[in-house]
From Swiss-Prot:
Alphabetical keyword list: Cell cycle, Cell division, Cell inner membrane, Cell membrane, Cell shape, Cell wall biogenesis/degradation, Glycosyltransferase, Membrane, Peptidoglycan synthesis, Transferase
HAMAP family per UniProt: MurG
Record SUPFAM superfamilies: UDP-Glycosyltransferase/glycogen phosphorylase
Binding residue positions for UDP-N-acetyl-alpha-D-glucosamine: 15-17, 127, 163, 191, 244, 263-268, 288
Annotated protein name in UniProt: UDP-N-acetylglucosamine--N-acetylmuramyl-(pentapeptide) pyrophosphoryl-undecaprenol N-acetylglucosamine transferase
Top enzyme class: transferase
Transmembrane segments: none
GO molecular function, one term: UDP-N-acetyl-D-glucosamine:N-acetylmuramoyl-L-alanyl-D-glutamyl-meso-2,6-diaminopimelyl-D-alanyl-D-alanine-diphosphoundecaprenol 4-beta-N-acetylglucosaminlytransferase activity
EC number of the protein: 2.4.1.227
One GO location term (cellular component): plasma membrane
Length: 355
């Protein structure tokens, strides 16, 4: 790259599903000599996480508007205007060649500020149904990309950038070759846990007995309660942890995953090549259902909406999957993954910066 290094501002915040894909793209472009700064909010996870990755972060004051009542809605135009002014001042100082919106409340005023300064806006939608901010920003964006088909009618499907340690796992046919014994079930409720998984899976374990071995990530503050639930049904041998620091190692251990279907989780499971039982969070937009649907359609997963996630249904499903069936599902999951998603997003950012 000749002359001055290109400059990227990443706009992403709030949840890991927005921040981690943004970090993957940022690191990829930094390795090519780009200068990267981040636009976020001071009270969400990006405030601590992004600087730990060696990336400078600027903050604007903005939060969500859903469910805040009439008073908050009346104040919203002024809040958005102030956030836009803050973002505009930050971008005037940094002078990015392109901004990349990865979702979260910060992308709205940030994207509008970039557009008002003539800076190209590249959007990436992680979920199977577009969020309100991205629906609105798509009208002014230079390029829109999507992880799953259907969020936008004409956007390129590029997948979700996932962690390199997950991408580095051996392929299912190598990883699962020669395995026997109990089916290894990884239960993941996300960092906050999932009450329905914590309540249901010990009962599933009791039904399945020694045909399964379970590693259950309970979420914060309930590890002891979940351990007691397993012990209370005569299944104290299963492993319960509050968090799993090394998800790649957990995926490598597992034969099948039982989990929510956040966008990043679904993409990681596909990249790892794992069968799954997905229990979508019951959101008004059914966002997590749409995230999981491509894997179910590919024959790699089963979706249980929360009311259908019963002890009997889950136990019968797991009991009905032989090791041969699980390997076939694992291969199907890997086949629909897009392992070069990070490179695809970074390539589009580079293309837009050159034009």
């Amino acid at each position: 790259m000749s002359g001055q290094p290109k400059r990227l501002m990443v706009m992403a915040g709030g949840t890991g599903g927005h921040v981690f894909p943004g970090l993957a793209v940022a690191h990829h472009l930094m390795s090519q000599g780009w200068q990267v700064r981040w636009l976020g909010t001071a009270d969400r996870m990006e405030a601590d996480l992004v600087p730990k990755h060696g990336i400078d972060i600027d903050f604007i004051r903005i939060s969500g508007l859903r469910g805040k009542g009439v008073k908050a809605l009346l104040a919203a135009p002024l809040r958005i205007f102030n956030a836009w002014r803050q973002a505009r001042a930050i971008m005037k100082r940094f002078k990015p060649d392109v901004v990349l919106g990865m979702g979260g409340y910060v992308s709205g005023p940030g994207g509008l500020a970039a557009w008002s300064l003539g800076i190209p806006v590249v959007l990436h939608e992680q979920n199977g149904i577009a969020g309100l901010t991205n629906q609105w920003l798509a009208k002014i964006a230079t390029t829109v990309m999507q992880a799953f088909p259907g969020a936008f009618p004409n956007a390129e499907v590029v997948g979700n950038p996932v962690r390199t340690d997950v991408l580095a796992l051996p392929l299912p046919q190598v990883r699962l070759a020669g395995r026997d014994g109990p089916i290894r079930v990884l239960v993941v409720g996300g960092s906050q846990g999932a009450r329905v998984l914590n309540q249901t899976m010990p009962q599933v374990a009791a039904r399945l007995g020694d045909t399964v071995t379970i590693w259950h990530q309970s979420g914060k503050g309930v590890q002891h309660t979940v351990e007691q639930a397993y012990a209370g049904v005569g299944q104290p041998q299963h492993k319960v942890t509050e968090f799993i620091d090394d998800m790649a190692a957990a995926y490598a251990w597992a034969d099948v995953v039982v989990c929510r279907s956040g966008a990043l989780t679904v993409s990681e499971i596909a990249a790892a090549g794992l069968p799954a039982i997905f229990v979508p969070f019951q959101h008004k937009d059914r966002q997590q259902y749409w995230n999981a649907l491509p894997l179910e359609n590919a024959g790699a997963a089963k979706i249980f909406e929360q009311p259908q996630f019963t002890v009997e249904a889950v136990a019968d499903t797991l009991a009905g999957w032989s090791r041969e069936a699980l390997l076939t599902m694992a291969e199907r999951a890997r086949a629909v993954s897009i392992p070069d998603a990070t490179e695809r997003v970074a390539s589009e950012v580079s293309r837009v910066a050159r034009t």
